[in-house]
């Protein structure tokens, strides 16, 4: 999938968890911030500052929000919300998980 947008892209990658998650920050013309990235097979815990909407582009994942005991699964075209000042666990198995993270 290819989208054409007016944006500034941080060409230096954000690399987390020994390379298991790699993303690039994007700032749209209106100031909206996003990141586009990939998570390799692993189970990882992320902390949030601002609220996030995670949009699945390819692959699949299971997530467990802070305070929850249950895992929810998401595939291509699906999204999940993560509250600000919180955390979530994400489990990726098999194929890499490609995402767009919408901040705020």
Swiss-Prot record:
Gene3D superfamilies reported in the protein's UniProt record: Jelly Rolls (2.60.120.10)
Pfam families in UniProt: Ppnp
InterPro entries: Ppnp (IPR009664), RmlC-like_jellyroll (IPR014710), RmlC_Cupin_sf (IPR011051)
SUPFAM superfamilies for this protein: RmlC-like cupins
Catalytic activity: a purine D-ribonucleoside + phosphate = a purine nucleobase + alpha-D-ribose 1-phosphate; adenosine + phosphate = alpha-D-ribose 1-phosphate + adenine; cytidine + phosphate = cytosine + alpha-D-ribose 1-phosphate; guanosine + phosphate = alpha-D-ribose 1-phosphate + guanine
Top-level class of the enzyme under EC nomenclature: transferase
MF term (GO), any: uridine phosphorylase activity
A cellular component annotation (GO) from this entry: cytosol
Keywords: Glycosyltransferase, Transferase
This protein's name: Pyrimidine/purine nucleoside phosphorylase
Name of the encoding gene: ppnP
